[in-house]
Amino acid sequence: MLVLCSRSRLTSSLIRRLKDQIANVSNHRSFATSEGHRLAIVNKRSLDILQDPWFNKGTAFSMTERDRLDLRGLLPPNVMTTEQQIERFTADLRVLELTTKDGPSDTYDLAKWRILNRLHDRNETMFFKVLIENIEEYAPIVSTPTVGLVCQKFSGLYRRPRGMYFSSDDRGEMMSMVYNWPAEQVDMIVVTDGSRILGLGDLGVHGIGVAIGKLDLYVAAAGINPQRVLPVMIDVGTNNEDLLKNPLYLGLQKKRLDGEEYLAVMDEFMEAVFTRWPNVIVQFEDIQNKWALTLLQRYRHKYRTFNVDVQGTSGVAIAGLLGAVRAQGRPMIDFPKQKIVVAGAGSSGVGVLNAARKTMARMLGNDESAFDRARSQFWVVDDKGLITEKRANLDPEVQPFAWKENEISLQGLNEGAKLVEVVRQVKPDVLLGLSAYGGLFSKEVLEALKDSTSTRPAIFAMSNPTKNAECTPEEAFSIVGDHVVYASGSPFKDVDLGNGKIGHVNQGNNMYLFPGIGLGVLLSGSRIISDSMFQAAAERLAGYMTDEEVINGVIYPSISRIRDITKEVAAAVIKEAVEEDLAEGYRDMDARELQKLNEEQILEYIEKNMWNPEYPTLVYKKR
């Protein structure tokens, strides 16, 4: 009894002392927030704390913590450092490399994902420390492209719940369901309906894998606290016949809802999450084309929400397009002079088109005539060929980019002209692929691009996953020439051109932008997420590279610099939110104080609000 009383007094005393320290810090004006004070009061101990990945430290629990949390004797006696834990984990991966290095790459990547996922399930702090320190190697494992394979095999890989599932069977219950999530505060939600997963089609409930992977990158790149992120799957059924017939499928085995029924489910979900967490940011992920733009327009002026496939992909593409202008030795202001042939008119293609047109128009004066002049710089080709006003049942979103027949005939083209014909006649500066059709940029198309009027034509093969890329970098450099600028949506290795020359592969991953967009919106307290924020973010990314890097064909920076890139992008978003009078501030930084910050102070503010994977001091307090 004496020992128990003594422990109780010790714990209570420690809680009071730590609370006093935080109160003292709060009384002094500082950019620091709770992200900088790694204290966590927990309501569990003993085996319960070891089963909680948010707080479990494994062998790194100190002896005093083991006493406070009733862990003494439940762990091996040697208290390990973080570095030692990473060394043990890395050793497991190196064994995997030795045993699978000669096997198929998919098998090896999936095996790495399994090992990382097991770490994620038992110790989130260690998982994110490993991910951040090896971001170039592991980002393609936790997200694109390996996550596509994970989603395809999800029913067999599922072991432990992560995130939340809202289904059409839950209609009328979602407002209460959101309170089943244990976190009192959620800053970021990534939600998918599984209808269009990475160009793999309708994967139903398996699609939650992309939401999980995307949030892993938010934490690693933007420093969003992992305890305040929530992956969500909206299961409204599936039209995938294989899943409907599979007795082991984990989702609803009925046809996908459509029309007003679908919208009713989405409306109820959005109302529920914003009722519990009014300041949360919701990012839509891998929603089929027919709904992606509809949902974005439906919610964007009411909630803090965006669609990474439409706006994120377009922002990264704009940054790359501006970088391609720089690679020609020209200033970015010359962007409106670029001739761009676009292959693909889905949600991603339309998003890029609209963003590029707005960027050009802004450079041309931002009036009605500027938008009209900008439109004439694009030639859009889909699976039926060149799009003109003669096209029947034309999507309203694509209508502004449809050429008039009398105008296009003067160029020797007509409705439905094949991609190779368009490239031959237009001689574009940029060939932009957003078609999700692997190999679309055939040898014939690439040879036609050799006649481009540009001194340095650019190829953007942006479709994911890797097999859907419109062409490989080897094909681009070998057919078009060493001078071409090449960007892709999935990772490829640089190409050895011989004579000591390297053909740089620029992965136009939307990872360059979406973490900074989310972080900037969060820290600015912006009421909504505007198109201008994406434009500001894209321009900041385009200007991130040095002149020397750009002249060498490098238009996107190394992913190893992603946290620094994210800070820069977030700063651009915060400044834009302030300029548009949308910023309301965050925590103890109100809107008026935010307006007073210069560039250096904004970056400092961002840095001090980014979560870092360091073990907090854990203190037990009974509920």
Swiss-Prot record:
Molecular function GO terms recorded: malate dehydrogenase (decarboxylating) (NAD+) activity; metal ion binding; NAD binding
Cited SMART domains: malic (SM01274), Malic_M (SM00919)
EC number(s) from the headed UniProt entry: 1.1.1.39
Pathway(s): Photosynthesis; C4 acid pathway
Chief localization: mitochondrion
Binding site for a divalent metal cation: E285, D286, D309
Reactions mediated catalytically: (S)-malate + NAD(+) = pyruvate + CO2 + NADH
Cofactor: binding comment: Divalent metal cations. Prefers magnesium or manganese.
Transit peptide residues according to the UniProt entry: 1-31
A Pfam family: malic
Cofactor requirement: Mg(2+); Mn(2+)
SUPFAM superfamilies for this protein: Aminoacid dehydrogenase-like, N-terminal domain, NAD(P)-binding Rossmann-fold domains
Residues involved in (S)-malate binding: R196, N464, N509
Binding-site residues for fumarate, renumbered to this chain: R88, R122
Active site (UniProt): S143 (proton donor), K214 (proton acceptor)
Gene Ontology cellular component terms for the protein in this record: mitochondrial matrix
Binding site for NAD(+): R196, N289, A345
Keyword terms of this UniProt record: Metal-binding, Mitochondrion, NAD, Oxidoreductase, Transit peptide
The keyword Nuclease is assigned to this record: no
Subcellular location: Mitochondrion matrix
GO process terms (BP): malate metabolic process
Enzyme class: oxidoreductase
Lipid biosynthesis keyword on record: no
Homology family: Belongs to the malic enzymes family.
Subunit structure as annotated in this protein's UniProt entry: Heterodimer of two related subunits.
Protein name (record): NAD-dependent malic enzyme, mitochondrial
